[in-house]
Amino acid sequence: MTNPLRIQQLMKLVDLTRLTDQDDADAMQLWLDKDLAGAAVLPAAVCVYPAYLAQVKSFLQQGQYAVKLATVVNFPTGTLPLAEVLEQIQHARASGADEIDCVLPYQALLSGQTEQVRQFLAAVRQASAGLSLKVIIESGELVTCQQISKATELVVESGADFVKTSTGKVKVGVTEEAARIMLAVIAASDRPVGFKASGGVRSVEFALRLVGLFEELTGNLATPDAMRLGASALLNDLSQQLDY
């Protein structure tokens, strides 16, 4: 049985995520009541589509939950015009978001448009000043180890707060191989950069392995400022383990 303190540590790393395409306010409220209000240990953040930011912000304030509010931009394909992405960030800020999860234009990176990607990241970082910025590289769509490494390097260089693996909307989410490559770049950085694993973090065992990788390769304890686990059901599964 996993040490209860380790389980609690993992729960504090979770970005409790609901990015369901067919959704409505009533379903969102039920989810908040069940998965957040019923959690034995609060997660680091709640991540929802921009349309639900105001609703979730109100819920967090009324319940006095010390939980960050996150949303997604340039999601999920990473192909929106930069001006539209900047508008999404402005809307998210006005709606009370604390954190922005932005998809890297990884298709541009795959086609060799490195400078375009660099300029995109610089603009997004400037627009999200004062907010925590997590950049999703969509590691499952990057063909080679070198591409994963390059994407991570660009995100680190941009001043983003976290490098995130996946949207959860493509076939391949986070893998241990991709995590190792990304963490090696993060560990070599001359400034603190967080790591967020998402897309397929469905089991407690896998989450434990990812946290172990983070701590092994960076030499740092996994805390919410340094690592996140993006997941929809993991928090509930971890809560159940605490009940045993």
Please report, for each region that a protein language model flagged, where it lies by residue.
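Terminal helix/beta-alpha structural elements that buttress the NAD(P)+-binding lobe
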Residues: 198
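N-terminal beta-loop-helix "entrance" segment that forms/cooperates
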Residues: 237
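Alpha/beta enzyme core
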Residues: 2-41, 51-195, 204-232, 240-244
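Short donor-sugar binding/catalytic loops of nucleotide-sugar-dependent glycosyltransferases
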Residues: 201
